């Protein structure tokens, strides 16, 4: 018999599969607490990056706070977190260097991530993560990007932006000890699958 946690995970994965594309497009235009000009700038930068990454056939996806925003879980996001396949790091780096500037690395002992690079493109902060590793209670979890982790795409302008799964990031936040993020995702899943208010 499935426990509550397993049933909740299935509900979150179901949300991943069905997606929030139409709602996310509406949120970009009409909702959220971000300043409209600031939001437009971030979307313009994301569209520009997406065009170059996809043209160069990079394996990449959006994760973290921007993923939560696109899925309708969070109303704000601060930077653009990009997960990249390790073999594509150099090409990713070269593309972003042609668009903006690279910042200094700032390692965090909770992570043993093999590549973490900060960029600024048109005043928008970009975090590039490859070989993502989370350390939880002394155990290392390899969270490197894999093709099957891309569960859907959202369209920005004419560009198709790949998204990682919401259930996957719930697990990542749990390993990170980010309780508030886990609770936010759980409440969202409960709301979306509630009687009369969930997705069809």
Whereabouts are the PLM-identified features?
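Short, solvent-exposed loop/turn segments at secondary-structure junctions
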Residues: 67-68, 133-135, 168-169
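Conserved catalytic core of two-metal-ion nucleotidyltransferases
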Residues: 102-136
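Helical scaffold of the NTase/Pol beta-like nucleotidyltransferase catalytic core
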Residues: 8-12, 19-61, 190-200
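Active-site nucleotide-donor binding segment shared across nucleotidyl transfer reactions
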Residues: 49-80, 84-86, 91-93
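Catalytic cores of NTP-dependent nucleotidyl/adenyl transfer enzymes across multiple folds
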Residues: 29, 138-200
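A short alpha/beta connector and helix-capping loop motif
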Residues: 93-99
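A short, compositionally biased
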Residues: 6, 110-115, 146-150
């Amino acid at each position: 018999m499935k426990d509550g946690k397993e049933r909740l995970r299935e509900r979150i994965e179901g949300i991943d599969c069905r997606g929030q594309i139409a709602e996310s497009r509406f949120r970009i235009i009409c909702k959220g607490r971000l300043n409209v000009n600031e939001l437009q700038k971030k979307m313009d930068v994301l569209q520009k990056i997406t065009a170059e990454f996809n043209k160069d056939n990079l394996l990449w996806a959006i994760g973290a706070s921007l993923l939560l925003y696109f899925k309708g879980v969070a109303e704000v996001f601060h930077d653009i977190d990009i997960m990249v396949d390790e073999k594509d790091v150099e090409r990713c780096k070269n593309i972003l260097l042609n668009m903006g500037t690279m910042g200094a690395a700032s390692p965090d002992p909770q992570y043993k991530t093999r590549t973490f690079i900060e960029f600024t493109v048109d005043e928008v902060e970009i975090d590039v993560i490859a070989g993502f590793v989370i350390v939880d209670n002394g155990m290392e979890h390899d969270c490197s990007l894999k093709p099957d982790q891309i569960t859907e795409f959202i369209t920005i302008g004419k560009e198709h932006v790949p998204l990682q799964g919401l259930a996957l990031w719930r697990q990542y936040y749990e390993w990170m000890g980010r309780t508030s993020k886990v609770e936010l995702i759980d409440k969202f899943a409960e709301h979306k699958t509630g009687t009369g208010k969930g997705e069809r």
